[in-house]
Curated annotation (Swiss-Prot):
Quaternary data: Heterotetramer consisting of two non-identical subunits: a beta subunit (PhnB) and a large alpha subunit (PhnA).
Protein name as catalogued: Anthranilate synthase component 1, pyocyanine specific
Enzyme Commission no: 4.1.3.27
Phenotype caused by lack of the gene: Disruption of phnA alone yields 22-34% pyocyanine. Double trpE-phnA disruption requires anthranilate or L-tryptophan for growth on minimal medium and does not make pyocyanine. Double phnA-phnB deletions are tryptophan prototrophs; they make less PQS.
A biological process from GO: L-tryptophan biosynthetic process
Tree of life domain: Bacteria
Species per Swiss-Prot/TrEMBL record: Pseudomonas aeruginosa (strain ATCC 15692 / DSM 22644 / CIP 104116 / JCM 14847 / LMG 12228 / 1C / PRS 101 / PAO1)
Reported effect, R337C: In strain: PAC174
Length: 530
């Protein structure tokens, strides 16, 4: 069928093809295989049934939005993106310094009022306003337009008084979002597939219409998602770690002194594992096979790739119901396996019982449930907060977790970005009280965390937000994958076990990277023989 054409407010239109519902990976489309930077995949699955909920693939982008402190840079990636810069220049907030330089629009936001009360600070002008302005410019009466991207852990220092880390080098922006040019959106619950092209520069119509037709033809002709298997017999043995077990255990002991002194009740230190990764996409596919999780994501930003399979949502907001939700995870045990590495059901159940009866784990989890309730109290209507699925156990490839779900109705004057600002960073990656815990983490961890512990997901012009915490993930730069993992520390934590927990959490990703490297080596050897 021919593409339907929908108007987009003031800045062009979109072309849309409704396709037969298929469970297809973007790799089946040549534009994904051939594309370079500025593309993203975000998959959501049901925790219990493992059934897919939604898959969004930004196949190509026209505008890239980066935030570094008070500076937001909107960079046009082609003529289609350039057509957006003029209306965005006109929509620049009055208190913001705006500079247009060719394909780049630079907005500098004023310093936040540090002495304002909490409600005024929440409503104050911040760099997050740039995302609202972009979505407002793209607003579509015929259906929401979305952005896909990343909030880093270090975005928090724009809103809270955090010390500078010992290592001042920064590699990851406070946030990075992409405005899609070509988008594949699969609603698995409604069994509906849509392929969309957004035309902001009329001169680019023919190019985008042709790309849309090509993708639609490929989509119809491609085979369904192949039943791949994880590479067998792989162990992640050649990784390096920035803190060895003994050093990490000593760090845990120093942080326990702060717990003892009453500075914090809980804190979540982390360490970084690294190993070579020549093919991030292949490593991502291996991770999904080995560690099927509710959120799976792949972001190619050009200067780095980020991929992961995360068990934990960051913040979800449904604009229609106005429900905002957090999903704290705290309390971990390894999966029960026999000598061959297969799941031993009896041992697995014993480990679950041990987890459910562990007073330290229960106390740690309830502390973070209370923190989530307190975070939502800042932005929700009074009397609407509730805790669901209290102390449920979710199982993943290498570990099992205690989880709960905390929800409430967002205050009528606030939106999803207000809610995210109030709740960042998620307590399960920080500790409690949150600000003091973040300050101590800056003091004891060497550098910026970057993507780890932040959030990745989609935000649309209707106001919806769906994000995953960036954990069980790898940030790949210059052929090296860095996998960060943390552990919740309380007064009676065993430092040795906390070091072991970080390793267990990192192993799913490290093993996937090792499997991808072996797969690549075997493929190269086969081609050499051929």
């Amino acid at each position: 069928m021919g593409a339907r054409r929908w108007l987009v407010s003031g800045v062009g239109y979109r072309l849309e093809e409704s396709l037969e519902y298929r469970t297809l990976v973007p790799e089946a489309l040549s534009i994904w295989r051939m594309a370079g930077a500025n593309r993203m995949l975000f998959d959501c699955f049901d925790v219990d049934s493992k059934a897919a909920r939604r898959s969004v693939a930004i196949l190509s982008s026209c505008l890239r939005i980066e935030c570094w402190g008070r500076d937001v840079v909107l960079r046009a990636l082609n003529s289609n993106g350039r057509a957006l810069l003029a209306p965005l220049s006109e929509d620049c907030p009055a208190q913001v310094t705006c500079l247009r330089d060719g394909d780049t629009l630079h907005w500098r936001f004023p310093q936040e009022e540090s002495h304002a009360d909490e409600w005024r600070r929440l409503h104050g002008l911040s760099s997050l306003e740039a995302l609202r302005r972009v979505l407002g410019t793209l607003g579509d009466a015929e259906g929401p337009v979305l952005l896909g991207g990343l909030f880093s852990f270090d975005l928090a220092e724009q809103f809270e008084p955090l010390p500078a880390p010992a290592e001042p080098a920064r590699h990851c922006p406070d946030y990075l979002f992409l405005v899609p040019e070509l988008l594949l959106d699969i609603d698995h619950l409604a069994r509906r597939t849509s392929l969309q092209a957004f035309v902001h520069d009329p001169a680019g119509h023919d190019r985008l219409a042709a790309s849309l037709r090509q993708c639609a033809d490929e989509f119809h002709g491609a085979v369904e998602e192949a039943s791949e298997s994880p590479v067998a017999g792989v162990r992640a043995g050649n990784y390096q770690v920035d803190l060895d077990d003994a050093s990490f255990a000593r760090q845990v002991e120093r942080l326990q002194a702060h717990v003892r002194a009453g500075d914090v009740f809980q804190i979540v230190p982390s360490r970084s594992f690294s190993m070579p990764c020549a093919d991030p996409w292949r490593a991502y596919r291996q991770l999904c096979l080995r560690n099927p999780s509710p959120y799976r994501f792949f972001l190619d930003a050009g200067d780095f790739c980020l991929f992961g399979a995360s068990p934990e949502s960051a913040l979800k907001y449904d604009a229609e119901s106005r429900e905002v939700e957090l999903y704290p995870i705290a309390g971990t045990r390894p999966r029960g396996r026999d000598a061959r590495g297969a799941i031993d059901a009896e041992l697995d159940n014993r480990l679950e019982a041990e987890l459910r009866l562990d007073a330290k784990e229960i106390a740690e989890h309830m502390m973070l449930v209370d923190l989530a309730r307190n975070d939502l109290a800042r932005v929700c209507r009074s009397g609407t907060r509730q805790v669901r699925d209290m102390l449920k156990v979710d199982r993943y490839s290498h570990v099992m977790h205690l989880v709960s779900r905390v929800a409430g109705e967002l205050h009528g004057e606030l939106d999803a970005l207000h809610a995210y600002r109030a709740c960042l960073n998620m307590g399960t990656l920080v500790g409690a009280p949150k600000v003091r815990a973040m300050q101590l983490l800056r003091q004891y961890e060497d550098g910026y965390r970057g993507s780890y512990g932040g959030a990745i997901g989609i935000l649309d012009s209707a106001g919806n937000l769906d994000t995953s915490i960036v954990i069980r993930s790898a940030e790949v730069r210059e052929g090296i994958a860095r996998v960060r993992a943390g552990a919740g520390v309380v007064l009676d934590s065993d430092p040795r076990l906390e070091a072991e927990e970080t390793r267990n959490k990192a192993l799913a990703v490290l093993t996937a990277v090792a499997a991808a490297e072996r797969e690549r080596g075997e493929r190269d050897a086969h081609h050499a023989v051929g």
